[in-house]
Each structure stands twice: as structure tokens, then as C-alpha cells.
Amino acid sequence: MQKLTRDEMAQRVARDIPEGAYVNLGIGLPTRIANYLPADKEIFLHSENGLLGMGPKPLPGEEDPELINAGKEYVTLLEGGCYFHHGDSFAMMRGGHLDICVLGAYQVSASGDLANWSTGAPDAIPAVGGAMDLAIGARQVFVMMDHLTRDGECKLVEHCTYPLTGVGCVSRIYTDLAVIDISESGPVVREIFNGLSFEELQRITPVALTFAQLAESA
């Protein structure tokens, strides 16, 4: 089973972000998307620490220590980009002004519930950040995650067992094996990578999947 690399996943998500979109890239894996957005598309990247017009990762030696994203990673600012207060940034997030946010996840349920801030372990450090605000405020919520954990457990589940970030908020999931939409009738597989069959994907996924072509012809 050949999986996409982290950068290949970021490239795949970048292809689906439309011209003119206002997008927040969550901490961790989603920040890689900034490096693969096509130069001929005008896309506005937002960071909750107070940036709009964020660009890709700077080249080695060109880092500005005062220009970072919410994950404390060095970023660049595109022409026309701006800075603003943290409170204003969260008003943008909560007010429905972002078209898309891309978040990581520990689990996503078949109905689109999101769990991405705690595993519930007694020694876990709660770190919800702005994820709850994004989950309810963005018009579309995309999730980037590995299909399986290191222990081989699928992250797409019937019901989340970890503390929830948002209920029914996820629109689409990008894993290292497939692209899956969350619909009213359940998860719909839009794309499978590297020759994996639908049957093989279903075998490792503990929720009922529908293949997009079958769903559209029904």
C-alpha cells in the first residue's frame, strides 16, 4: 500500500483551493499547502495570530524572526498583505469571513464531527487554539490527516471517541490514501491514490463508504 508523502498531500489539497478564496491553514501539516499554491491564482492565506496575505515558507537565510504563523513557523508576506490585532483575527474566523480552513485531526466521524485537540489521555496537554472558532466559522472545513494511526487504526470512524472540536463541521477529508467528502448520506470517496482499490480502502476503513461514481448514478 503506497501512501502519499506529506508534501504530495499538500499539493493535492492546494489543487482544490479556488481563485479568490480566503483560507486559514491550521498548525502542522496544513501549513505545507502554502508552498504549493499556484502562482497564477490569487488566494488569501490567513493566520489567527494576525496575518492576511501570508506567503510560502522563506528560503534558508531569508527568515524574518518577527514574521511567523500561529504555529511559530517562519513565513513570508505577499505584496498587499497586512497585520492586525489578534482579536480582529478571531472576529474574521468567527464571523464567517473565511471560505475554507484546513485542519489536522485525530479523528473525523462519518457525519463530519471533528476531534483534533486532545486524545483525552490523563497526561495530555489541552491545545485547542483557534480550531473551535475555525470549525464553526469557516464556510468549508477541510481535514488533512493520515488514514491510519501508527497502530494501524483508522482515523475516519463511525463516532469520535476523543473530545470534539466541532459537530458536523467537516466538508472534505484528504488522507494519504484518498479524498473523501462528508455528505448527508455518509462518506463519499472522490479519489483513491496510487492504484489502491475501493475494496482495499473499505477493508481498512470501519465506516461504510460510497464510491463517488456510484453515488452520482444512484
Where are these regions (language model features)?
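N-terminal active-site beta-alpha-beta segment that forms phosphate/nucleotide-binding
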Residues: M1-L78
